[in-house]
Amino acid sequence: MTTHYIAGNWQAGQGETLQSLNPVTQAVIWQGQGADASQVDAAVQAARQAFPAWAQLSLEARIDVLEKFAAQLKVHAEAMAQCIGEETGKPLWESATEVTSMINKVAISVQSYRERTGEKSGPLADATAVLRHKPHGVVAVFGPYNFPGHLPNGHIVPALLAGNCVVFKPSELTPKVAELTVNCWIAAGLPAGVLNLVQGARETGVALAANPGIDGLFFTGSSRTGNLLHQQFAGRPDKILALEMGGNNPLVVDEVKDLDAAVYTIIQSAFISAGQRCTCARRLLVPQGAWGDALIARLVEVCKTITVGAFDEQPAPFMGSVISLQAARALLAAQVELAAKGGVKLLEMTQPQADAALLTPGIVDVTAVADRPDEEFFGPLLQVIRYADFDAAIDEANNTQYGLAAGLLSDSRARYQYFWLRSRAGIVNWNKQLTGAASSAPFGGVGASGNHRASAYYAADYCAYPVASLETASLALPATLTPGVTL
């Protein structure tokens, strides 16, 4: 099976056997063999050979290819949404919004490039100061499974726009989405070698990250893998490394007037995408007392009614499946562990079908747990922590190695300003779902959540490096020579 796209040609893999499964039915969606180290190297070399010509194209010529790619996505939007839903388990309504985000990324990236990394100049007394940006060269892009189209697209589009060439390794759990995406690039007329696709799991990823021919690596995924990459690239300032990782995100609730609005926002923050967004709320901080009791009771009541189902089920469910049976089992095990440590299951997360990766929402009160794990439970498992006062809530919110997203539900602007100032996170929302983000704003966090603002407006910053120049059209002696020099 032709599973890799290298130097403009599809070819079969020479590495480990791979399968992509529908997480609900367990039907085989895609199968092939991963790329071995020699194929990874061939992809890097193909990108290296294509780089000079691609980088020397005018910006407008590269934009033309990107816009044709967006047009191809529009043509194939239904098939792409179907594939995303089938491979990830997310409902079709959500898969369709992901394709829309992929399409919109082109215009956003062009605007960002012009504003943040375009050419600027200013006159000096005897020269012109010019700021331009140059591409790094060949960059590797590692994509995640939760948004297999949108998130790698957020690296690839600005990287190509800046003049880089790319070797793309998607998640081994979503190879078909990657294949469809690359086919859209081919149909858009992207020259051979500019974008290369290598499918595979750990073997392929290790070979790509270690290949001396790459000038950088852009990664979106788990903190565990991101930390390994960070260690691998330690002492290599010659390589650009952009990491967008996870979070143990807190959502603090104040005593707001509209209880149901708070409940709805919590659900959208914790359980959308079956809890498989890096910005999902993992910890819900609720005030002690009668108001907090009422909020939790209402939250549990509503969460019991949340519909869970297959990606194409009608009427459409709110939540689809998690990515795999393995992921579902790990989440169920995490719930058991929290209970063993003293957590109280307010709403037990269950697996309605033993052979399907469908999970119902789970809510565990971990207030009494002394050694709460600072982990990202990547699924529909929400931990509740009761707090005595607002300062204690902020302290608990910041009690994490991560720093991706934090949110406050409060009727008080003063409280929000106080919260915003003290929060340690790259995204801080007020009375909006934690998973909400603006495409024109930076996306990313601090601490163990990453180092750059990946896949969004500020992606332009790490896809090219600034070059400062002093320029004048003719060489001439200055009117006054430096002391000690005679001509």
From Swiss-Prot:
EC number(s) recorded for this UniProt protein: 1.2.1.71
Listed InterPro entries: Ald_DH/histidinol_DH (IPR016161), Ald_DH_C (IPR016163), Ald_DH_CS_CYS (IPR016160), Ald_DH_CS_GLU (IPR029510), Ald_DH_N (IPR016162), Aldehyde_DH_dom (IPR015590), SuccinylGlu_semiald_DH_AstD (IPR017649)
Biological pathway: Amino-acid degradation; L-arginine degradation via AST pathway; L-glutamate and succinate from L-arginine: step 4/5
MF GO annotations: succinylglutamate-semialdehyde dehydrogenase activity
Signal peptide: none
Residues holding NAD(+): 221-226
Keywords for the protein's UniProt record, in alphabetical order: Arginine metabolism, NAD, Oxidoreductase
GO biological process: arginine catabolic process to glutamate; arginine catabolic process to succinate
Similarity comment: Belongs to the aldehyde dehydrogenase family. AstD subfamily.
Function, as annotated: Catalyzes the NAD-dependent reduction of succinylglutamate semialdehyde into succinylglutamate.
Name of the featured protein: N-succinylglutamate 5-semialdehyde dehydrogenase
Organism: Pseudomonas putida (strain ATCC 47054 / DSM 6125 / CFBP 8728 / NCIMB 11950 / KT2440)
